[in-house]
UniProtKB/Swiss-Prot annotation:
Any one GO biological process: regulation of membrane depolarization
Modifications the protein undergoes after translation, according to the UniProt entry: Contains 3 disulfide bonds.
Keyword Secreted part of the UniProt annotation: yes
GO cellular component, one term: extracellular region
Keyword Secreted: yes
Name of the featured protein: Mu-theraphotoxin-An1a
Family per similarity comment: Belongs to the neurotoxin 12 (Hwtx-2) family. 01 (Ap1a) subfamily.
UniProt KW keywords: Disulfide bond, Ion channel impairing toxin, Neurotoxin, Secreted, Toxin, Voltage-gated sodium channel impairing toxin
Amino acid sequence: IIECFFSCEIEKDGKSKEGKPCKPKGDKDKDKKCGGWRCKIKMCIKI
């Protein structure tokens, strides 16, 4: 079994309301000015 750890950050956009991060809800959403999650694999270990 291989277990991986992720390091996630919230991408913030200057145009978002009050500087709060938010996620796009769908393709039909007209307001896509907010940031989203950006994840990177930190490390993987074998158990």
